[in-house]
Amino acid sequence: MSIRDLGYRPYDGERHPAEQNTWVILRHSLGRAWRSWIIKLTLLFSWIPVMGFILVSRAASLFNNDPTAAFDPNPWHDWLLHAQWLSAAFVIALASGAGAIAYDLNHNAFAYFFSKPVTAVQYLVGRMGAVVVLCLLVTLLPAGLFAAAMVALDSGTIEDNAISLARATAGALVISIMMGVCSVGFSALNRSRAFTFSAWVLLFFVPWG
């Protein structure tokens, strides 16, 4: 079926160079994800765990039996990233990544995308990149907020918190890239979004037993 049969019309506006294809697909993917109320609620409530971690870590410091013991932010950042990975990042990958390619297949979007000078790499990077960006919002930003709160509350030195934040940044990048690549990859398994969603959930939770 040609793209004209799908209702597309010739575009008479400004044409951007092919090098911007990835950016265009990324913006489209982010816009499509933002229209989901699940994504909006996840981004909204993803800040609750970090506030809890700030309060609990502060309480732990105040009630510490050894006042001379130095505050170590590393385990707190590890627990925070783990909590965000198993909750907010999982939901984002499920809602915006695990059905991305299946959605395009069902709506014949490939006929539109690949009628233009769009390469498979540009398409995949754009689709995966949106999941990565959204996952960074719920992993890296909370880690940064936690580090800033610890500095403001004088829990640990600035140097220790900066080093811990750099370590958490690397962890957030690994988590976000993994979630983007794996979830979008699973979305190519089948045209059925229900199948790809189920496969993603099984992969994510079954290994944890």
Outline where the language-model segments fall.
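Short, membrane-interfacial amphipathic segments enriched in basic
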Residues: 4, 8-24
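Secretory targeting signals
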Residues: 10-13, 55, 72-86, 125-191
